[in-house]
């Protein structure tokens, strides 16, 4: 293309002229900050800065003198110029149209920034703002504004431009207040909100285990808002701020004494990490004092505003402050930008080119806003080389493409051109700025509902080199932090990652007991059994569910296993052996009694009733089989009835025999004979039946009124769930024993004081000892059952039943078995039947005399008296 060839030749000649002029040569670079077009974009850039800041020092509204030069501000302005020229030279966005630009210096001062802002809002073709009731048809000099760079300035200009609904796109203002659409409806930016940067900072602190930090901000809108956001989010995430303060502005402020006190507190505490959310000027002030006070090396988490600032990087003594980390927004590479800057400088040094600018752009209105950028006309490539790759350059560049895309949509441009129509007014452009998607250098961007863009961050680390540190990428933040630990290095003693915690991390199974006002200062307390530590930051132990358990210092709960009196337990096996013994003895005695059923001994013991009592005693022994194993509803209901009814049957036979002995010894002979006849006849079985019916009625009442049920007790055992039969009323449980206790008591009363005749079998003694065995076992049962662990209560009841049965067998039945087996010569009517033998002596004698052999003894119960 001949135009590009001519431009390249001109740039080459200009570059030669620039080298010939040297460093002190004057150029016309400031004149390149303005270009006419169909639509003009205003620009606010920090091309310089003033020595004294603030309005309090002046008594008159005089002009602020900007003496310092900012190379970054000029580079951002040149990036906007480059973007406009690319759009004008291309046909993708605004074919047939030319954008213009009008770029001014803000001097980093709100008062200075307002002057060009007023010029921007002047009516097209004039230098003043007309007063109207309705500005709908008002056409200002600019269609949109790019800038300013700082939050402090954007808060001032943002309200001003929002009144006219003029779109404003900042390339550096990040305070979250600017996202408020109620106050700043026309504000947009190509940098993320501070809220995103703060979230990245907090996640970095969490990832590195730093929860005891100091937080410092600059005493301006950017620092105060950022510090407020950080404090709120850090507290919500369990990060404690040990010290907090503001760096006063300007540097000569009388409040710097408070800053020195803050630095001394940080130096004397265990804080090893300082979050510094401030402007570059405030950061330089802080580090100047920290170097002077010889603050020990710390880790400085930097905000984006000062992380790449030459004001801070070039401060003498900075390598001794420690490690500096911070987040920078990502952007698309701009490899052509350094070449473009060199070309602009070369052209600015060309007198012919400068003369052409004077002819094309007469009257720069310097009488209104002052010199546009006098320092720019003395700049050299060496002055700008350090900031050529600054990350914010792309943000300024992308801002132009965002406005151009919205204008493209407003004009409904296509490949052939943009349809002619009335000039677009700022408020019409604003309608198409909301949620607009655009591309800059291949990177897709979009303004969201709050005017922010979705740009990710790189985590940068200062690696100290001479003269300024190198920025090394050690991680990224794309909604979540990704840290590259292998790339990190620590400028601290020992080159080890510093620890910044008020208290050590609690061990597993411990929770924090906060001491003082900071949640990060705490004592570690063990979680007791039955509770556990759910999360490392828990302040209280979490109780396990009732079906779970945990040991001391646990981090989880375990399921409780059901526990009951299992068949395989040693105690149960011992009781089963005892059962076998008792049942074996009862069956052996029953068999022996049946074999000798007609003998005087068996007849004296009750005959069939004695066999019935032994059978019931065997059933009593078998009832213990209902206690082992997992309890069920049926087994719980059957335990007491199946034990008490057989025992009642056994004791009722004893009662009849005791009554017979009592009658024979205590009543007159005539009455005794009558009563014996009744006690030995069919009426005796009626007594047994009535006793068992009475016990059955008690058992039925017990099961209906207070039915035992299967319950699972979760707390009685430390690691298991006890499954057992629960007794609702111990009074009713005792009343079920009433029938048996009464029978045993009557037996004892009827036999205790009875005297046997010499040479006769003492049947009363066996009954007395049998009842004593009953009472001893069941009286011992009460305190033992009440004090033993509930898990072993079924075993206690089993043992009591078996001991009771064995006691009855040992005191009443086994002595008779001994006589049957070892002393058969005593098994005679004279020894056992007493009065019956005397009453029927002739019958016994005749029977034995006639046959000469032993005769069958008649049943004393059924034989005639």
Swiss-Prot record:
Q: Which PROSITE patterns match?
A: G_PROTEIN_RECEP_F3_4
Signal peptide span per the entry? 1-24
Pfam families per UniProt: 7tm_3, ANF_receptor, NCD3G
Might you name a Gene Ontology BP term for this protein?
detection of chemical stimulus involved in sensory perception of sweet taste
Q: How does it assemble?
A: Forms homodimers or a heterodimer with TAS1R1.
Does the keyword section mention Cytoplasm? no
General remark: Unlike most mammals domestic cats do not prefer and are unable to detect the sweetness of sugars. This is due to pseudogenization of the TAS1R2 gene which prevents the formation of the heterodimeric sweet taste receptor TAS1R2/TAS1R3. This molecular change was very likely an important event in the evolution of the cat's carnivorous behavior.
Q: What SUPFAM superfamilies does this protein's entry cite?
A: Periplasmic binding protein-like I (SSF53822)
Query: Where does the protein end up?
Result: Cell membrane
Q: Which InterPro entries match?
A: ANF_lig-bd_rcpt (IPR001828), GPCR_3 (IPR000337), GPCR_3_9-Cys_dom (IPR011500), GPCR_3_9-Cys_sf (IPR038550), GPCR_3_C (IPR017978), GPCR_3_Ca_sens_rcpt-rel (IPR000068), Peripla_BP_I (IPR028082)
User: Which parts of the chain span the membrane according to its record?
Assistant: 574-594, 607-627, 643-663, 686-706, 733-753, 766-786, 795-815
Q: Summarize the protein's role.
A: Putative taste receptor. TAS1R1/TAS1R3 responds to the umami taste stimulus (the taste of monosodium glutamate).
Official protein name in the record: Taste receptor type 1 member 3
Tissue-by-tissue expression? Expressed in taste buds.
Carbohydrate-modified residues are 134, 267
Residue ranges, Extracellular compartment? 25-573, 628-642, 707-732, 787-794
Q: How does it sit in the membrane?
A: Multi-pass membrane protein
